């Protein structure tokens, strides 16, 4: 089905040209995961038990695990994106507060997390540039820095760890379109080869390839995809 990469962080982001109601919006992905697995479970009923009621009860028990398992792994992965390993009950709120600020200020999802690591080595400028009004972000940053201190690990090591899970390069939609247009309409696969050579090492920043880190120009937003893309 239609797929794409999100530039600015907005939970309501939808790329499919036919998804007018936002059924497959970014924020709805966990619910859609559950819906898809439930449909799969329905097809498995005859294979689980000859007694339909017993089969449904068994499958329901498994399906009820989806939400807590998803939420657990989401928190683990989001913690790693902001350089945290230790478990703190306040982390969920800390992460969601950042996401809310990003949503309000149209901050780029990929670059926010990548540039956040730079603050640990003295560069606050790059990440602050992603926010129209950085006051809220600055307040959040102070809370995050206090939390990072609890890790009891050198800042340089945390920054390195963050850069191993936060890519600098993703398949930006406008760059993918440029590569496809060149290959299909101009019989030139060089842009595609270049893009692929960068994407195979998404965590390694390459000097001179800054254009591949940038979101699409406003003239190419919103980006729409179609079934069969």
Predicted regions mapped to residue ranges:
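Flexible glycine/proline-rich, aromatic-decorated loop/lid segments
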Residues: 1-18
